[in-house]
Structures are given as C-alpha cells and as structure tokens.
C-alpha cells in the first residue's frame, strides 16, 4: 500500500532512482520469478515514467484517467448514493452537489469517505479539511506557467479547461508545464477529468471549498478578498439589500473580468458564479435556468 510515498514526498532524485531500482528487483527481475506469483500495489500516483515509459511496465494500471473494468469500485456510484440517502433520510440533491462530480470512464463517482461521514453525521459538510490538502493545491495553482491562473479561474466559475495529460511523468517534483500541474491535481483528486472532452474541472462543492481555503493561504490576495465576501453577498441577497448586493457584485466584476470583456455575457456569468461562490453550501444551484423570456444565469 502507498507504493508512491517516496515519489510524492521526496525531491531527492537519487533516492527516487534507488527506490525504483528496488521495486524493479522486487517485481520485475529474474530472481523475483522464484518467489512472486502476483503483485498488487496501490497508491495515489500511477507508476513513475522513465523516458515516457513506466518503470514497471509489467503492471496493469488503473488510474483516475483510465479505470475500466473496475470503475464502479473507485467510490460510491450514483445509484448507491441514492440508496444511502433513502436509508439515512438525506436529501439526494444536496449530497450530489457536495460530493458528486468525478466522471471516471463515463461513470459518475462520489467520494466514499465524505458520503459515509455525511450519512453518519446527518450533515453535508466538507470532510476534506486537513491542511496538507491546501498546501498540495497551492503548490500547483501558484506555479508560474502561462494560462494556469486563467484556467483555475475558469474552473472555479464552474467551467472546464482542456488539459493534455500525456506529458505528466507521474512525479510531483517533475512538473514542467500547466498541463503537468493540472494532471497532478487530477491524480490527487482535486480535479475531475472528462475523458471525452479531455478537460479538467472542479468536481463538487467539497473540493471547491478546499480550493477556497487554499486561495486564502496562498498568494491570490485579490481573489481571496472577493471570495471572503461571498457569504455577505448571499445574506444581503436574502435580506433584499440591493445596495449591498450591487456593491459586492461590482467588486466581483472588477476582480474577475478584464476591461476588454467587462460587459461580455460569459464574463458576467462568471462574475455571478464567483460572487456566489459559497452559495452551493446552502442551496442547490441551477445554471442557465429557463426564466420565461431567456434564461437565468444563476438560480
């Protein structure tokens, strides 16, 4: 178990190389044939690549990108969650907003630990609160690669971004591009991956909260300040305080859009989504909802 612990926690290339040699001798050498009938290892990362090939290419890998035929065992399926909600008298739509979103080989997958905790506590909340989560997210979203910040903003607003997962070397210390950074977050579970569209996205509100906390502890001061006012905006909206609502949305508009796209429809939709960033924690959100004439961006 945790075969990749050394890979994830060490920047010492010599140590990693020695560790891979050890694994090779254990699982792929001529000597291992005398004592090994079958090897089964688990971890977060796929087996590290050496010159674009797996260091242990005699293993069959199942990852967050490709998991057939064992996909249904990765977490709770939607049908299983519906049954649990019925058994524990929990609102399915709320559970779905908090913990759904992973689309693995076409199967909707829910975080099993979080769903279990929600059923036991009878409360939808973030059960992914350890500080290492925020540190892991920050490590990758603050990397200085062209377009990375824009992609993070797009995903925070509910969008998807194209990502090429092929160049990632399955090593968190070997990141050379925006695509590598996003692929690392996919394997760590902080991003979902749509294989049909080859795109990444933030899967649910629980993970969005982890991103929110990461932004507060990182270098994204302007974004963090805007997000910190989301609850204030939500309360002002409920109270019918149009002056306060206008003020906070104007701040969000200035924060999340450029002068060139200030009145662009997609930009305005992004502004509303980010301005009400914490709303899914309290309400089921519907985007592009039919509203008589036209559509409501955010209901």
Feature locations, PLM:
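Active-site metal-binding core of divalent-cation-utilizing nuclease and nuclease-like domains
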Residues: 280-299
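Hydrophobic, well-ordered secondary-structure elements that form the walls
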Residues: 185, 272, 298
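Phosphate-binding site recognition
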Residues: 1-266, 278-286
């Amino acid at each position: 178990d945790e075969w990749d612990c050394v890979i994830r926690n060490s920047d010492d290339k010599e140590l990693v190389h020695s560790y891979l040699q050890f694994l090779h001798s254990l699982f792929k050498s001529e000597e291992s044939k005398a004592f090994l009938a079958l090897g089964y290892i688990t971890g977060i990362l796929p087996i590290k690549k050496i010159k674009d090939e797996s260091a242990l290419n005699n293993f069959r890998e199942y990852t967050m990108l490709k998991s057939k035929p064992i996909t249904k065992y990765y977490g709770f399926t939607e049908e299983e969650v519906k049954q649990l909600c019925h058994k524990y008298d929990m609102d399915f739509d709320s559970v779905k907003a908090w913990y759904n979103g992973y689309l693995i080989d076409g199967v909707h997958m829910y975080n099993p630990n979080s769903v279990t905790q929600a059923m036991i506590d009878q409360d939808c909340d973030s059960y992914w609160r350890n500080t290492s989560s925020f540190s892991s997210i920050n490590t990758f979203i603050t990397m200085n690669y062209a377009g990375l910040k824009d992609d993070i903003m797009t995903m925070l607003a509910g969008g998807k971004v194209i990502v090429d997962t092929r160049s990632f070397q399955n090593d968190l210390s070997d990141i050379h591009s925006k695509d590598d950074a996003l692929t690392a977050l996919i394997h760590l579970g902080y991003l979902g991956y749509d294989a049909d569209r080859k795109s990444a996205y933030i899967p649910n509100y629980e993970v969005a909260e982890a991103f929110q906390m990461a932004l507060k502890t990182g270098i994204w001061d302007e974004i963090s300040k805007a997000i910190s006012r989301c609850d204030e905006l939500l309360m002002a909206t409920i109270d019918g305080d149009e002056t306060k609502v206008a003020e906070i949305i104007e701040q969000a508009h200035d924060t999340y859009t450029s002068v060139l796209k200030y009145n662009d429809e997609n930009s305005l939709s992004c502004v509303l989504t980010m301005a009400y960033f914490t709303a899914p924690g309290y309400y089921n959100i519907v985007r592009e909802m039919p509203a008589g004439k036209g559509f409501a961006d955010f209901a």
